[in-house]
Amino acid sequence: MSKDATLSSLNQIFIRALKRMGDAGDADAACRLAAQAWSLLRQDWPKEAQRLNGAMHSLTKPDHA
């Protein structure tokens, strides 16, 4: 597996964990973690950063707030 594919898989796992945090009532902490990860990925892996951006938007929907 390439490094990019590995990163993509890890990011998908991370996003699932963030969504579970949100479902468990800790959407604020999940958003903070997602924002930190987005900051790390945005320059070199913009596609993965965009996936995290989508997760942050999902976490801020009224059902998570």
Name each model-derived stretch:
Residues M1-A65:
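C-terminal-biased regions
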